[in-house]
Amino acid sequence: MTFLQNPHFRPGPATGHPMLDQHAARGAAELLAQVFDHPPTPLVSLREVAARCGVGAVHIKDEGARLGLKSFKSLGGAYAVIRLLLREASRQLGREVSVTELPRPASGSLALPAAGTHDLPAHPDVARVAQGMTFACATDGNHGQSVAAGARLVGARAVIFVHSAVTPQRRQAIARFGAEMRLVEGSYDDAVAESARQSAAQGWTLLSDTAWPGYTEVPTWVMQGYTAMVHEIAQQLDAPPTHVFLHAGVGGFAAAVATCLHSVYAPGPKVVIVEPRQAACLLASALAGARTKIPDGPPTLMAMLECYEPSLVAWDLLQPLATAFMAVDDADAVTAMKALALPQADAEVVVAGESGSAGTAGLLKACADPAIRAALGLDDSARVLLVNTESATDAARYEAALGHSAEAITRRRAGASAAGLLSKQSPA
């Protein structure tokens, strides 16, 4: 494990962003609610983890059930598809197009409805615009699912670029939405570059979740979609968090959630960014004092976080806002997966994938080190917030790491829910 107190830490008004504040979060949540009839994801009180860590409270926002895609990414890519279609349809039709003119899935889920199966179909003019649009992106797995599912929902085409380390199960999870799959040799960053080249050449709409100079608007829309979960958290927590551990790949999720939390709970919690040791590009950037691309490293079990260059927008927000950066090992992620999946209390069971457990891994490692505990103020008054960003998106990998199937763990939690043990943690 590597730990770095951020030498550039300087929170204040300059660390905010108007597209990622509490007002933007409410707007994102309201837009999504007009398209999807979907309840908030649960906020689970982890009493055993809190006792193990010696802190006052630990809560985890469980995004594993978000819109049927098993990941928080369904808030970002699909949200940006909707925003981009609304803008393009308004431009082509010469009038402001409302979200009420978009299709509404009959199931309230991005995953379940067959193409064209909606409670409310799209306005014919808007549907024609959508049919002429192609959305393209690179992915480690989850963002591509969200873009592909969002494109299918509105009737557009999707082309998804995956690199060679994306597992067959994750590729199939994207392809089921009718997306055209393009394989790129190399890393996620190579897939990002190829998706940008092909989009420019083909006239496609590039929908990346990472930003670079000259390309920031769309990734910020993706990040704005993520803030909808903060809008929910603010209604679910009884007291403001003092600390939040957020894992990062390119940093878009971490920057969006941290920035929005600081808007909701000014002056906001201490923010600790957690990355895989093999792909700690944000930690390297903090050490260098500038956004830094690191060399491709060996693969990590935390595959959704295997990125080697921070998003420009994310880095600009996190550089002054993060209290500290951490890098954890694959074994730490497995320890966290087990802590979440196998507590003594059924009501605290959380199915967290290898990447979804990384923030929890950071908390467990920090609390086990007296010097880090002291540096972060992790004492019995601390109220820690975590986010499980994904459930078992690759069932075989999950079972191999944990020794238990995701289905078996889910059944245990379902039993607690049926017994009414989750009623206070999972608002309707």
What are these model-predicted stretches?
Residues 1-428:
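PLP-dependent amino-acid enzyme catalytic core
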